[in-house]
Amino acid sequence: MAENQAKKEQVHTVFQNISQKYDRLNNIISFEQHKVWRKHVMSTMNVQKGSKALDVCCGTADWTIALSEAVGSKGQVTGLDFSENMLEVGKQKTASLENIQLVHGDAMNLPFDDNSFDYVTIGFGLRNVPDYLSALKEMHRVLKPGGMVVCLETSQPTLPLFKQIYSLYFKFVMPIFGKMFAKSKEEYEWLQQSTFNFPDKQTLKGLFFEAGFNDIIVRSFTGGVAAMHLGYKENSSSKGD
């Protein structure tokens, strides 16, 4: 418990400090591939007009904005993040979008009723949560029966060549970017550690099952450096079938 609290405070400090630089940093570190990956994921999701979506760990609201376009004017998207500074950047970007609400909150204790959303997403945020399973269980709780959960996150490469490149990148390139954008050694070290230590796609798939999701689809991107996990909450009408 104390370890989780320490991680929570560390991550909060990091994102409070890098909020103004986060979008640029994300573009540089991923070589703008995160935009390509998200487009693929949105295409797979096939979000329905008029639906309600929750974007957990929404950060500066990039995925929140994509969801708002997908649900249309009759839909509603809520973005949640625990960094007030990240949300401030997000609010500036979403000021003209009436179907978006940004909320300050904790991914491990979501301030929403059970069965509230048709879609729940989390993009490049799960690795920053102290307890992955707790966050996934909360996402399951607030998802409507039959609803879809989607996680887009860094992963551990599976192809040998990408494994070597990935390792070299994190040892030599990431520290340079970190020093350029982060205010302290602690901040850029966290950016490295949280990505490098995140579970591989099969381990994460197991956590999705443990959280209660079914019919999980896993898709790798760019040699496995990122992965999508898509699952569903059991439809109550199907119980007992």
Swiss-Prot record:
Stretches of the chain forming a coiled coil according to its record: none
Domain of life assignment: Bacteria
Record-linked CDD domains: AdoMet_MTases
GO molecular function term, any single one: demethylmenaquinone methyltransferase activity
Transport recorded as keyword: no
EC number(s) from the headed UniProt entry: 2.1.1.163
PANTHER family: 2-METHOXY-6-POLYPRENYL-1,4-BENZOQUINOL METHYLASE, MITOCHONDRIAL (PTHR43591:SF24), METHYLTRANSFERASE (PTHR43591)
Protein name as annotated: Demethylmenaquinone methyltransferase
Record lineage: Bacteria, Bacillati, Bacillota, Bacilli, Bacillales
